[in-house]
Structure formats: C-alpha cells, structure tokens
Amino acid sequence: MKRKFTKTVLNAVFVLGLCSIMGGTSYAWDGKKDGTGTHALIAEHGLTMLNNDLNQNEPKPIKQNIEILNKYLKDLKLGSTFPDYDPNAYDLFQDHFFDPDTGNNFTLDNKWYVASPIYDTAETQVRKFATLAENEWKKGNYKEATFLLGQGMHYLGDLNTPYHAANVTAVDSPGHVKYETFVENRKENYALNTAGNDTTQGIYKDAVANKDFDQWMTQNSVKYAKKAKALYYSHSTMKHNWDDWDYSGREAIKNSQVCTAGFLYRFINEVSEDQISGNNLTNEFNVVLKTADNEYAGTDDNVYFGFETKDGSKYEWNLDNAGNDFEKNQTDNYILKVKNDVKVNTNDITKYWVRKENRTPISDDWELSNIKLISNGKVILQKDINKVFSGNQVYDINK
C-alpha cells in the first residue's frame, strides 16, 4: 500500500536495484510457465512415487482421491510453476526462501537488505496453499484445489533448494544461479519413481503420525530445509567442485521428490477423512483478501481486519505488506500475530470485520471481492463480500 511516500520510493529504488543484480528472479529450481521444468518434474514424480508405492489395502476414499489427483496432474504441474510467474508476486520472490534455524527469509536475516521486511516464507506459503487446496477439494472444486496444491508444492521444492534454505541469494553469491542451472540441466538424471517402500512404511508412515496437519506441515518443512541447508555448506558453494554439485543436486532433488510424495499422501489423507482439527487455540492467523477485477477497484487507503471474542476482547490488524496492496484483481495475504503471544480460542470468536480508513480527506474507494481466514491449517472463515467501501467504513461479518 502506498502509505509513506518517502519510504515507499526508497524501497522501490532499492528493490529495482536488486532486481538488476538478481535478474528479477529468485531462480530456485527452474519452472516454465507452461508447467514444465524442475518444479514440474518434482511434482509429477512425487505423484508417480505415491501411485507406485500405494498399498493395496488403503481405504477406498484414499484410492478414489488419488485417482482424482491423477486426473488433474496437468493442473498440479501448472500450479507448481505458477508462483514464479504470479503477477502479484514480491519483486525479489522473498517468500520463496526459508532458513529452518531462524524461521525467516533473507529480508530479516541478511544485513544488506534494508527495504521493508517480508514475513511470508516458503514454509508459511506451503501451509497457506495446502490449506486453501484442502478447503476447495472438500467443496468438490478439484481443478482449483489441485492448482493451489501445486503452488504449495512449489514452495516445498524451494525450501529443499540448498541456496534458499541457507538464505543465500544471487546478491550474496553468483553460485546461486550457477548451481541451480547446473541442476536444471541434469534433473532427468535425478528423477525417482518410488520411495523404496509402500505407504505403510517410511516417509508415508511418518507423514500421518502427527494428527495436527498444520503442525506436521511446519515440522516437515523444517526437517527438509535443514537437509537442504546442510547440503549448501557441505557440497553446494562456489568453493566446491562439479562432483560436489552433482552429489548435492542428486540429494536435493531426491529430497524434493520424497518430500513431495509424503506431502501428497498426507494431503490425500486429510481430504479423505471427515475430521475437524481439535486445536482451536492459536496466536497466529492468515487472512487472504481478493480485490475485485473492476476498474478503480483498488485503493491506497488504510485497510484493517479484526475480530471480537465472546468475552468482549477485540483484536485488529493494519493490513500493510511491502509494496502496493489492494490493487485491481490482486490477492493479498497477511500473517497476523496476536500481541504478546496471547492464545485465542477460535471457537470464542463472535464476529469479524473489515474496515477501511481514509488516508486523505478524499476517499479512495475499494471493492472487496472475498475474504478467507486460516487458522491451524483450516479455513475458519470464507465469505464473498462483493462490496464497495467508501469513506471510513466498517463491514461486519457475523460468524
């Protein structure tokens, strides 16, 4: 959102300068707009592994949902490359990075980065897209669900990339692009078709051990990102030789495929069971808002999201990411953390609201299409709004 003009201009100049250095891309595993490249290979072979490893005694709903996923393989692959071409993406793809030891992307960990920090990471994006995918799947929107799931698999692939797990960008080292180009040219040599065991063992058994989907996703991402980060320091820097890079690439792509196969198995289990998460306490939410695709739908005014609990406590957040928020036809995502790590019971929420506040005496109207709120790996609020906000206005959403 264009709030603080001087700060925004400085951020823009800084980011444009970095784009010229980094080539305007995070690079990571390669992916083409048409659903080909390394990311697509990882997604496809992850599903192939699951099909080949599927125990024949799996429940009927598991088998049926895997068949649906097979039917929409093309959408899975398209989703797996889309984040690199999303017109609403961060200019430096900051959310494609995740250091498992700090929990941050490079905007918080690398001292040379002086623009506004980005709090989305590859880990948070995996959880967001998988949750949105599960929500659409359970409504029968399989094509959209699979495309969203593919986007989650993109970020899962990114955190398996050694340079991304170590928060080493093209600014930090020319090896970033060189290494990933090296791997792209050899990706077919690293392809797998099985995890080496069926779905009653190994990665598949591990994938369903923790019944809390949201917790498991974080644990899974941290586990594999640690492997990727270790590979960076042991075999992937500019100090290492071609044999080291070949070993690193083989291990990293193997981990990406194995990780994907396990994740797809867990996802299929989630959508095959009528279960409700028992964890209703949280200090973090993820709100996703879609601005309408109409002329003048966007706004530069301040936008807030909040809710009230049955004890009268009110919580509200100013929705402001780096760059421009609430542009025409743009989907904006915000990680909302409750102050002082206070845990909120989502069952106690009685109402939600969206509030627009003028920044100048003249209102900059805004048309909101829809909103979704994520908590603990579940969509707990989804509503089509389709409303124009004028002036200082509050829109209440009853639970």
From Swiss-Prot:
Residue ranges of the region described as Linker: 275-282
Binding positions (Zn(2+) 3): 84, 96, 154, 158
Cofactor(s), names only, from the UniProt record: Ca(2+); Zn(2+)
GO molecular function list: phosphatidylcholine phospholipase C activity; toxin activity; zinc ion binding
Alphabetical UniProt keywords: Calcium, Cytolysis, Hemolysis, Hydrolase, Metal-binding, Secreted, Signal, Toxin, Virulence, Zinc
Residues that, per the record, bind Ca(2+) 1: 298, 364
Entry note about domains: The protein is composed of 2 domains; the N-terminal domain contains the phospholipase C active site (PLC), in a cleft which is also occupied by the 3 zinc ions. The C-terminal domain is a putative phospholipid-recognition domain, which shows structural homology with phospholipid-binding C2-like domains from a range of eukaryotic proteins. The ability to bind membrane phospholipids in a Ca(2+) dependent manner and toxicity is conferred by this C-terminal domain, which also contributes to the sphingomyelinase activity.
UniProt protein name: Phospholipase C
Organism classification: Bacteria, Bacillati, Bacillota, Clostridia, Peptostreptococcales
